[in-house]
């Protein structure tokens, strides 16, 4: 930058001239004799005074000039810049030095040094580097300015004017600073107005004119460069000063409009307009001002009348904009002024100040009507709010292709000088809303015509009252794109014709422009960040051979250029204007908006803002689809915004992660209603980027830890060995030679395959013996590190970012439309299982036989052991995720795999946790089991650890101190077991007791003292097979004798299978019941106990009958060599009465004998079958009692549901045991002989025993109300058979029924042909009488115990006891 003190910025030095004069030596006397001139080069970055330049600075070219119009060096300060004595300046010979001008067409650098702020398929927004240091250092200072086609920018404050080439490629450009002669008195005063004046014939550089709005003072410099040079050399005034006469006290100037070469137009706050010239007719500097007459007002109107008649119908100060267009002849310009209410006025101005009104029109009503018709939303705004904000002239002389592409009217083709073709920026406002439109207007002497209306739909913010600059409209060549510049936004609007369609044709007929490309560039809401000046660049400007100005920007596309304090120059450039005229014009897409927000909004120093101003003009579905597409492109580096060959891969990956974070942040800020699928897909992409970054860092760690000769890590191997169909192939011809970096740049979306390939590398190296044992050990360690760490990182990222992505991390997404979780794909889960099992083998191998190779790193092996529980946890989690996701799928293959995974999970969640015990990972196994609520494994591990410690404590080889330590630790683990029971409840406690019972026995279960919730009691009560332990627990732990009795009785009555056990259990239960009920005063309780005791006694009676039968049969088979022989002998000896053809009865008898000899508890019906089918011999009466009587007792005490049918069966078998036809043959027999025949029958013996039992048990009366004929027909039909045979096949059941019918036929023969019913009555009476006789003789009752013997103890009818 040119400065009175030499600036030392690096970039500036690159643009300085190399033609420097040799620095004189200190002894050079010429320096001492030359007078010292005061240099006014003050650096903009300095404050207050300019220090004396040092010798080191003397040969640097000046970068900034400060020009003083006052010839007298007054000792005053303006805007902090002091004026020192002339002695402080450097040697005069440096003052004329300037940077060398490049030749025509020469570029100062290959690039313009700009920084892209955003870009899309239509335009690019960039920040140019050139900005005066002082403006950059004081962004809060009040300023405004303008951009000129000459390549210069102008900025004005209250005290200074700054001119610099804004297209310069250095940050500190050559800057000309002009101290204004008459600065504003108050900070609130309007800022000075300024403009560059086209170069004169004697100079290539423009001049500068500055007008003070309030005072009307004008200062003009003919050339900015010569003014600076002369001012420094001569120290005298080089600017021309004057004042505008005729201004009112309350009037100030609002606009300074260039109408060169004719001069300038001044717009006053009162509404007046004046012409100002800065050169006289001979081209010499000179300032003159003339007020313009109102159109059609006549020459008689003076300047005062002009104030009344100008813009007739409008209020004072109502002029919104004034612009000058080329006139029909050289030196002529047409100036048009537009009032905010829609009144247009036109003058033709000649060089020298001559002017004439040419047209006037009030188009307000027509504008309102046209806009309302084109944009229905404006009808909701009050018509009083309508105003014209600015206008721009439509370029003439356009190429036919641009004319055809434009939707403007045929006026584009007219070349009449009398027609002024314009585009008006108009708007409605209401509160915080506004609607803007671009309206084509043609102004002619006879009036105005309204053409196409182009609504602005993307920007609805009203104009800020405090904005330093009013909205500006630019329509640069070829008039296909309009730029609407607001204080904090720029609208880029296409003016091309939309594609042909019926709708577009109707809209065209109505002068309505259908929607075409439109986008908004927003600036941040910062007090210092607003547009304070603007301009445009257009193709063709400055391309003539005579134009040698180095700073004029040559462009092929229309551009808007903006000036923002603190930021500098911002250029909004159309990328390719030809696309707008093509069949595929650019359009705003959801993806392009997302790209801008993501890739440029992430920069903290970007003055643009991409969110929060307005909703996205797309549906949620469009935005979601675009977001997913963009996310994939970021992950795969398929977007041009991400370099494909980054210098730092880690930095590149972190940037991509930041882009993904910016994407979801933007979507949330815009309140996009994302569906669940979109949220999960975006989250999965972000997870993959985060994990891939972590893996790359591990890769670099692996490389650093490996020796120089062995740099092939598991990660580099995986990148090479992954199937070519599962990765992007290298293009070696294009220089792609690094497969690892290439994968991390292009294939991260396949991260699940990469992670799964870790096991494949191990498997390949192991099976192919590509690595020795130390090398394979390192690969195993790397594989475990990558698999475990990658999945941990992914799930932690998911947990941390769940709220941001709007998902529940604890819920696996399900549904056919939702993607498969990448952390639980088939490749991941399958290879995790294999890797885990390989680690088991690898650790077991080296635990059994440690490696003797000195290169084998045991620390890596220990790390694998330490990470094995975590790796197992990741395997379980992946399995669980996949099962949950696949369960909702309708794909048959997925469903099959889901079922397979469910089975694998159920198996592995136990086996692989318990497996950890083998590697002394007890605590880790406990935590893993707790995490997955694997209660079986948890119980196994916890109990196993307790038993291991107890065994170690009891080991005689263990030292006493170690034994005590183990015993104490075992107690601690028992306490933890108790806490786990409380934490996980009954299910876990039950499993723990099962493990404890199986491993340590009953004593360990009953002695466990840390069950505070009584889970053992619930467990034992719920386990009928453990009733023998349960009743002990009831007594010892619960103190519940009644409960013990209930347990014992329940076991003995319904579940016990061994006779002896049943007898003991019933007896103990009875004892406990008596003990519990003995202390009760409750009569109801006593009654209940009494009823239970009766049931016990009945069960015991049945048991005693079985025991008697067992003892009788055992005596006959005690010589058998084995159990099979016992059964065979018993069947042979006691089953002789069963006909061989009746196989069913024989099978029942044989099965019953086998069970009887095994001491099994027989069901009552089986026991009755044995008693009634056996041939026990005559001696059994005395030994055990009558068999049929015992069968009747069983039927009586067993309380059978079908007791009557059973009794009929018993009596039928009893009656058919004897041949009643012989008893009925009484011929030649006396009474005594006949009675003796009756007394030898089984019926008599059974009846005698029944009457004898009845004397002690009145309820026992199985012989009353029954006669032989009543026993017919029992169990003779299949449906009558008892429940024992319900599951038998029909063949067996048929045979059994046939056997029953055979019995029935035999009995029927006795009834019908042997008078059995009559003999039954006589036999019954005889048995009853003989029981009485026996009682009178004082004989012991046959049933005095509980079982009678069926005989009469010598009181038989054999003659020793006579009948009376």
Swiss-Prot record:
Chain intervals with Low complexity compositional bias: 49-62
Magnesium found in the keyword field: no
InterPro entries reported in the protein's UniProt record: Nucleoporin_Nup133/Nup155_C, Nucleoporin_Nup133/Nup155_N, Nup133-like, WD40/YVTN_repeat-like_dom_sf
Region of interest called Disordered, as start-end residue ranges on this chain: 1-114, 531-554
Disulfide feature: none
Main location: nucleus
Annotated Gene Ontology cellular component terms: nuclear membrane; nuclear pore outer ring
Keyword Membrane: yes
Bilayer disposition of the protein: Peripheral membrane protein
BP terms from Gene Ontology: poly(A)+ mRNA export from nucleus; protein import into nucleus; transcription-dependent tethering of RNA polymerase II gene DNA at nuclear periphery
Subcellular location: Nucleus, Nuclear pore complex; Nucleus membrane
Record field: compositional bias (Basic and acidic residues): 1-11, 65-81, 90-110
Keywords: Membrane, mRNA transport, Nuclear pore complex, Nucleus, Protein transport, Translocation, Transport
Any one Gene Ontology molecular-function term assigned to this protein's record: structural constituent of nuclear pore
PANTHER family (UniProt xref): NUCLEAR PORE COMPLEX PROTEIN NUP133 (PTHR13405:SF11)
Similarity section: Belongs to the nucleoporin Nup133 family.
Subunit structure as annotated in this protein's UniProt entry: Component of the nuclear pore complex (NPC). NPC constitutes the exclusive means of nucleocytoplasmic transport. NPCs allow the passive diffusion of ions and small molecules and the active, nuclear transport receptor-mediated bidirectional transport of macromolecules such as proteins, RNAs, ribonucleoparticles (RNPs), and ribosomal subunits across the nuclear envelope. Due to its 8-fold rotational symmetry, all subunits are present with 8 copies or multiples thereof.
Record function comment: Functions as a component of the nuclear pore complex (NPC). NPC components, collectively referred to as nucleoporins (NUPs), can play the role of both NPC structural components and of docking or interaction partners for transiently associated nuclear transport factors. NUP133 is involved in nuclear poly(A)+ RNA, tRNA and pre-ribosome export, in GSP1 nuclear import, in NPC assembly and distribution, as well as in nuclear envelope organization.
Name of the protein in its database record: Nucleoporin NUP133
Species of the source: Chaetomium thermophilum (strain DSM 1495 / CBS 144.50 / IMI 039719) (Thermochaetoides thermophila)
């Amino acid at each position: 930058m040119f400065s009175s003190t030499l600036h030392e910025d690096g970039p500036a030095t690159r643009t300085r001239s190399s033609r420097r004069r040799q620095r004189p030596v200190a002894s050079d006397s010429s320096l001492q004799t030359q007078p010292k001139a005061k240099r006014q080069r003050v650096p903009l970055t300095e404050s207050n005074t300019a220090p004396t330049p040092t010798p080191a600075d003397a040969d640097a070219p000046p970068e900034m000039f400060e020009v003083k119009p006052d010839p007298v060096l007054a000792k005053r300060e303006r805007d902090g810049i002091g004026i020192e004595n002339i002695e402080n300046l450097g040697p005069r010979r440096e003052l004329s030095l300037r940077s060398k001008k490049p030749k025509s067409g020469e570029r100062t650098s290959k690039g313009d040094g700009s920084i892209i702020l955003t870009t899309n398929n239509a335009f690019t927004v960039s920040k140019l580097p050139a900005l005066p240091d002082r403006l950059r250092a004081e962004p809060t200072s009040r300023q405004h300015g303008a951009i000129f086609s000459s390549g210069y920018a102008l900025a004005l404050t209250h005290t200074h004017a700054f001119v610099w080439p804004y297209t310069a490629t250095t940050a500190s450009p050559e800057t000309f600073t002009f101290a204004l002669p008459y600065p504003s008195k108050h900070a609130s005063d309007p800022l000075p107005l300024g403009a560059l004046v086209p170069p004169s014939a004697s100079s290539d550089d423009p001049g500068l004119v500055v007008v003070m709005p309030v005072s009307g003072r004008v200062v003009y410099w003919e050339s900015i460069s010569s003014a600076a040079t002369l001012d420094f050399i001569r120290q005298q005034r080089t600017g021309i000063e004057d004042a505008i006469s005729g201004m009112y006290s309350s009037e100030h100037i609002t606009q300074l409009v260039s109408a060169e070469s004719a001069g300038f137009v001044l717009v006053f706050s009162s509404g007046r307009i004046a012409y100002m010239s800065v050169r006289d007719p001979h081209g010499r500097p000179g300032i003159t001002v003339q007020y313009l007459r109102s159109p059609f007002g006549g020459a008689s109107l003076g300047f005062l009348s002009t104030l009344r008649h100008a813009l007739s119908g409008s209020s004072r100060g109502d002029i919104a904009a004034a612009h000058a267009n080329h006139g029909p002849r050289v030196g002529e310009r047409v100036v048009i002024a537009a009032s905010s209410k829609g009144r247009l006025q036109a003058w033709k101005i000649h060089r020298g100040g001559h002017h004439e009104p040419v047209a006037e029109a009030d188009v307000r009503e027509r504008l309102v009507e046209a806009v309302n018709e084109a944009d229905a939303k404006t009808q909701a705004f009050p018509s009083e709010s309508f105003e014209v904000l600015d206008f721009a002239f439509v370029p003439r002389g356009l190429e036919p292709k641009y004319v055809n592409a434009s939707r403007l009217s045929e006026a584009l083709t007219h070349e009449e000088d009398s027609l002024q073709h314009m585009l008006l920026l108009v708007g409605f406002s209401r509160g915080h809303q506004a609607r803007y439109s671009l309206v084509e207007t043609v102004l002619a002497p006879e009036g105005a015509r309204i053409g196409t209306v182009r609504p602005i739909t993307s920007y609805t913010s009203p104009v800020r009252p405090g904005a330093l600059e009013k909205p500006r409209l630019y329509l640069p060549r070829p008039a296909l794109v309009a730029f609407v510049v607001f204080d904090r936004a720029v609208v880029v609007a296409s003016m091309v014709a939309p594609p042909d369609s019926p709708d577009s044709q109707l809209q065209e007929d109505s002068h309505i422009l259908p929607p075409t490309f439109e986008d908004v560039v927003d600036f941040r809401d910062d007090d210092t960040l607003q547009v304070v000046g603007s301009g445009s660049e257009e193709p063709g400007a400055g391309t003539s051979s005579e134009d040698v100005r180095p700073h004029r920007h040559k462009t092929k596309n229309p551009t808007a250029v903006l000036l923002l304090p603190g930021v500098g120059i911002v250029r909004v450039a159309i990328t390719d204007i030809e696309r707008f005229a093509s069949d595929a014009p650019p359009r705003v897409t959801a993806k392009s908006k997302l790209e801008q927000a993501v890739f440029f909004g992430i920069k903290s120093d970007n003055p643009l803002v991409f969110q929060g101003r307005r909703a996205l003009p797309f549906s949620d579905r469009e935005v979601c689809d675009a977001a997913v597409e963009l996310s994939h492109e970021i992950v795969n580096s398929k977007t041009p915004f991400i370099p494909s060959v980054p210098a730092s891969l880690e930095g590149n990956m972190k940037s991509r992660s930041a882009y993904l974070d910016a994407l979801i942040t933007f979507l949330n800020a815009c309140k996009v209603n994302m569906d669940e699928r979109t949220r999960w897909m975006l989250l999965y992409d972000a997870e993959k980027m985060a994990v891939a970054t972590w893996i790359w860092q591990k890769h670099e760690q692996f490389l650093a830890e490996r020796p120089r000769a062995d740099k092939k890590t598991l990660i580099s191997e995986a990148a090479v060995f992954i199937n070519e169909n599962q990765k992007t192939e290298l293009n070696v011809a294009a220089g792609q030679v690094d497969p690892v970096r290439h994968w991390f740049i292009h294939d991260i979306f396949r991260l699940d395959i990469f992670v799964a390939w870790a096991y494949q590398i191990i498997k390949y190296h192991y099976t192919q013996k590509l690595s020795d044992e130390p090398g394979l050990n390192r690969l195993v360690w790397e594989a475990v590190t990558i698999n475990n760490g990658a999945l941990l990182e992914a799930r932690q990222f998911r947990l941390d970012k769940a709220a941001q992505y709007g998902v529940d991390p604890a819920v696996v997404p399900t549904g056919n439309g939702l993607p498969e979780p990448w952390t639980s794909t088939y490749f991941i889960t399958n290879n995790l299982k294999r890797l885990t099992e390989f680690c088991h083998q690898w650790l077991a191998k080296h635990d059994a036989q440690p490696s003797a190779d000195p290169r084998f790193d045991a620390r890596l092996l220990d790390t694998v052991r330490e990470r094995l529980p975590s790796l197992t946890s990741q395997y379980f989690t992946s399995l669980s995720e996949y099962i949950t996701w696949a369960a909702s799928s309708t794909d048959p293959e997925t469903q099959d795999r889901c079922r397979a995974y469910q089975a694998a999970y159920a198996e592995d969640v136990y086996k692989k946790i318990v497996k950890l015990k083998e590697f002394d990972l007890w605590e880790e196994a406990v935590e893993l089991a707790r995490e997955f609520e694997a209660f079986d494994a948890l119980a196994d591990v916890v109990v196993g650890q307790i038993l291991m410690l107890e065994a170690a404590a009891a080991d005689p080889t263990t030292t006493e101190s170690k034994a005590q330590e183990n015993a104490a630790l075992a107690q601690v683990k028992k306490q933890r077991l108790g806490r786990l029971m409380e934490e996980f409840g009954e299910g876990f406690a039950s499993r723990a007791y099962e493990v404890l019972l199986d491993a340590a026995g009953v004593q360990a279960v009953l002695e466990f003292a840390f069950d505070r919730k009584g889970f053992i009691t619930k467990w034992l009560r719920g386990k009928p097979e453990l009733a023998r332990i349960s009743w002990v627990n009831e007594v010892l732990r619960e103190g519940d004798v009644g409960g013990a009795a209930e347990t014992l009785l329940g076991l003995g009555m319904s579940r016990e299978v061994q006779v002896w056990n049943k007898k003991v259990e019933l007896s103990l239960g009875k004892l406990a019941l008596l003990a519990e009920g003995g202390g009760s005063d409750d009569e109801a309780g006593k009654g209940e106990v009494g009823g239970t005791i009766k049931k016990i006694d009945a069960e015991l009676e049945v048991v005693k009958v079985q025991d008697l039968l067992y003892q009788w049969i055992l005596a006959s088979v005690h010589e058998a060599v084995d159990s099979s022989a016992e059964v065979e002998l018993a069947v042979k000896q006691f089953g002789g009465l069963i006909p061989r053809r009746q196989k069913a009865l024989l099978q029942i008898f044989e099965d019953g004998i086998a069970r009887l000899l095994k001491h099994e508890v027989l069901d009552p019906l089986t026991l009755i079958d044995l008693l009634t089918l056996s041939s026990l011999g005559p001696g059994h009466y005395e030994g055990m009692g009558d068999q049929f009587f015992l069968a009747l007792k069983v039927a009586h005490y067993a309380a059978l549901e079908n007791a009557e049918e059973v009794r009929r069966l018993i009596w039928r078998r009893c009656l058919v045991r004897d041949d009643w036809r012989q008893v009925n043959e009484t011929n030649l027999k006396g009474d005594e002989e006949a009675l003796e025949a009756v007394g030898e029958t089984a019926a008599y013996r059974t009846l005698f025993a029944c009457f004898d039992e009845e004397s002690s048990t009145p309820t026992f009366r199985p012989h009353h109300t029954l006669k032989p004929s009543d026993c017919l027909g029992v169990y003779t039909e299949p449906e009558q058979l008892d429940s024992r045979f319900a599951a038998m096949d029909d063949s067996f059941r048929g045979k059994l029924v046939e056997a029953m019918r055979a019995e029935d036929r035999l009995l029927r023969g006795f009834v019908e042909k042997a008078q059995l019913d009559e003999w039954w009555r006589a036999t019954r009476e005889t048995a009853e009488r003989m029981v009485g006789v026996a009682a009178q003789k004082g004989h012991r009752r046959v049933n005095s115990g509980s079982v009678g013997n069926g005989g009469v103890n010598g009181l038989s009818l054999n003659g020793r006891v006579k009948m009376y």
